[in-house]
Amino acid sequence: MPAWIFVNRSLALGKIRCFGFDMDYTLAAYKSPAYEALTFELLLERLVCIGYPHEILRYTYDPTFPTRRLVFDELYGNLLKVDAHGNVLLGAYGFTFLSEAEIWSFYPSKFIQRDDLQCFYILNMLFNLPETYLYACLVDFFSGCSRYTNCDTGYQHGNLFMSFRSLFQDVTDAMNNIHQSGCLKKTLEDLEKYVKKDPRLPILLGKMKEVGKVFLATNSSYNYTNAIMTYLFSISEAEASGRPWRSYFDLIVVDTQKPHFFAEGLVLRQVNTDSGKLHVGTYTGPHQHCAVYSGGSSDMVCELLGVRGMDILYIGDHIFGDILKSKKRQGWRTCLVVPELSWELDIWAQEKERLEELKRLDTHLADIYQHMDGSSCELQVINFTKREIQMPHESVVEQEQANLDPASCLLSCNQRSLPAKSCLSSAI
């Protein structure tokens, strides 16, 4: 599948004086699902270490289930697919899809305030995929374990109550713990297994440097960045010894803490590239070629490189941390890396006939509504057309609910349905 570039507005690359890059999932692409499986295994081990049941270790990472940009409901433990306006499109409790009635009972008008950070957490990044799957696994485990009583907002075990909010906090703490130690260490121990290497990368950056300035701004530490970038640019022994990776950049900034980097930022400190340690005090001298800095801000990048916001094209994978903040606060031109698009474009090509049929049915339904007079015949046609449009999992859920007492759709403290694993990413 060739790489595609989509544009929201025209961009004259000849006017770009400076190219900026994030590292993780931009210059450094991690191999999927091997990298996510590693993270997932380390998360399970960490949770067991802090007291979670050993039985959760039976779960293995399934790359077909999670997708990016799902929302975790910290109150009810549901994973939600939400559109840009806050409308709930799909929901899952563990591996069980929520019915229409269940979604309405949890979220009146099928709507949520996505910026309500007290209740909802948006799993924005590719780094969040193992975490997303873990939430489903934990809900699946505790819901099906006879030792725990299912409640609306968590699980009761004797005199102990574990809320979904505390479960969320435990997973978040585990993520922070493994990324500071275990995951980074395991990745560096076997770079070939977890990191993709593209021989075209040095060529690309070399050409960019011929026509402008190039900088790297990453949240990763220097030692990790140095190991990853050395691997990516060591295409051959001759090239590795002839040109170090730092020579491809005019400016290198690590530990940026984006999106904070695009606001007031942090103290700019220089990194000792031999030891990886930071020099004491704020760096106030002129920019030194191939030097590495820690912290700083986007304003300092512009000052050190002598460029303005509109002169910069910044390329990253995080729509919030990399793209929106740099665009809105600094006026940088931006390019979002979305690796999932390759997969989705493949599906688009494979399912072209089905998509055309859906478009035809949608147009047909609109025509019926436009000219309907309320006759029973037209209502039958409308219902038939709607059933044709429904996705398979929606039809199954609808049929299951038709066979149940309506009152059973309202989930009480002890009546949450047991999970039956589904594929959330493909359904979405």
Curated annotation (Swiss-Prot):
What InterPro entries does UniProt report for this protein, alphabetically? HAD-like_sf, HAD-SF_hydro_IG_5-nucl, HAD_sf, Pur_nucleotidase
> Does the UniProt entry include the keyword Magnesium?
yes
Residues bound to Mg(2+): D22, D24, D317
Q: Is Metal-binding a UniProt keyword of this protein?
A: yes
The Gene Ontology terms for molecular function here are: 5'-nucleotidase activity; metal ion binding
Which Pfam families does this UniProt record tie to the protein? Answer: 5_nucleotid (PF05761)
Gene3D superfamilies listed in its UniProt record: HAD superfamily/HAD-like (3.40.50.1000)
Active site residues according to the UniProt entry: D22 (nucleophile), D24 (proton donor)
Q: Which UniProt keywords apply?
A: Hydrolase, Magnesium, Metal-binding
Describe the family membership recorded for this protein in Swiss-Prot or TrEMBL: Belongs to the 5'(3')-deoxyribonucleotidase family.
What this protein is called in its record is 5'-nucleotidase domain-containing protein 4
Q: What is the organism field in this record? A: Homo sapiens (Human)
